[in-house]
């Protein structure tokens, strides 16, 4: 542990370094970021503590610019940006400094800078400011994060998704559905995880997405509703039982099973209306056989026996029709 007096001297030295950087000394700025990019956590913490102690709005504006553009004034903020791991540590340190408050004055200073940043003419600064406000769970960031999902590059799309997930508010659901529809790559995957983290806060966005023009997005919305026990998903969710993708078929079956009796009529309709291919037979059997209710199992016993074997489409359809007719009687 650093003795108290020595620690104070170190902070005075770092404060002087920061002041020189703010006055235009690029070598001092480079040294500041050498601290923030260090693998030594103690060095990073000393500099982060000093950022808070200085209480200078110019510093927070510079740091916002560094996160958005990797620039200190008009030059690269740090030579170590050329090392991806060091650059990631710099960004993480900046984010941590913006999110953690040591006083009310510290908090107000940063929020003022970030709100100004969201109105900047440079989209990259807007996205960075909204991202940091989102990490602080400030819902005023949502419209700019939504814009980032529409227009930003891949990195800032992922950061926007991260911030929306952290806020865990129903207003975050619609932008995440938009991100889900972007592609089938990392943005899609990140949005899917974020929606899952929102849990019930995503419900209204899921319901709206049941009418999405993209069938795959409708299925994701239905699956999300199924996970939170909302039976409005069932009629769309069952489409996943005959999807070409095996992972979608099995994920569909698991969610339908958790919905138990409320999912049965829709599954029966699928078996009545569609040819019983082997993939559909397996997925339907898995959904029905995995339902937790003993009463449901007993009612479905004739159909489960047929689906367990190599039944014909006609056999399964006939039994499904009888069960459906009797289901609510």
Locate each region found by the language model.
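Active-site glycine/GP-rich loop and adjacent strand/helix microenvironment
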Residues: 297
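TPR/TPR-like (Sel1-like) alpha-helical repeat modules
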Residues: 67-69, 302-309
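Short alpha-helical hairpin
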Residues: 108-110
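Structural detector for internal amphipathic alpha-helices that build alpha-solenoid repeat scaffolds
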Residues: 2-23, 30-37, 42-54, 61-69, ...
């Amino acid at each position: 542990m650093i003795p108290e007096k020595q620690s104070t001297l170190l902070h005075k030295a770092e404060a002087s370094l920061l002041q020189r950087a703010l006055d235009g000394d690029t070598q001092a700025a480079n040294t500041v970021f050498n601290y923030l990019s260090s693998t030594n956590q103690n060095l990073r913490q000393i500099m982060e503590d000093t950022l808070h102690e200085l209480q200078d709005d110019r510093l927070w504006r510079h740091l916002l610019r560094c996160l958005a553009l990797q620039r200190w004034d008009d030059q690269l903020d740090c030579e170590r940006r050329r090392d991806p791991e060091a650059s990631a540590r710099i960004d993480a340190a900046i984010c941590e400094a913006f999110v953690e408050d040591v006083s009310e004055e510290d908090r107000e200073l940063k929020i003022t800078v970030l709100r100004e940043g969201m109105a900047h003419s440079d989209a990259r600064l807007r996205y960075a400011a909204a991202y940091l406000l989102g990490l602080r769970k400030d819902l005023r960031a949502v419209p700019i994060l939504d814009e980032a999902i529409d227009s930003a590059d891949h990195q800032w799309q992922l950061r926007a998704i991260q911030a929306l997930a952290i806020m865990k508010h129903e207003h975050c659901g619609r932008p995440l559905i938009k991100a889900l529809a972007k592609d089938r790559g990392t943005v899609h995957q990140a949005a899917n995880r974020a929606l899952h983290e929102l849990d019930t806060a995503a419900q209204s966005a899921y319901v709206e997405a049941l009418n999405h023009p993209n069938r795959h997005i409708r299925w994701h919305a239905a699956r999300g509703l199924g996970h939170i026990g909302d039976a409005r998903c069932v009629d769309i969710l069952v489409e996943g039982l005959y999807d070409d993708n095996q992972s979608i078929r099995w994920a569909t079956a698991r969610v339908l099973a958790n919905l138990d009796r409320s999912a049965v009529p829709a599954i029966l309709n699928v078996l009545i209306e569609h040819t019983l291919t082997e993939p559909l037979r397996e997925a339907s059997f898995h959904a029905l056989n995995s339902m937790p209710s003993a009463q449901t199992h007993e009612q479905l016993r004739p159909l489960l026996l047929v689906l367990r074997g190599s039944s014909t489409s006609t056999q399964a359809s006939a039994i499904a029709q009888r069960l459906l007719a009797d289901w609510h009687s």
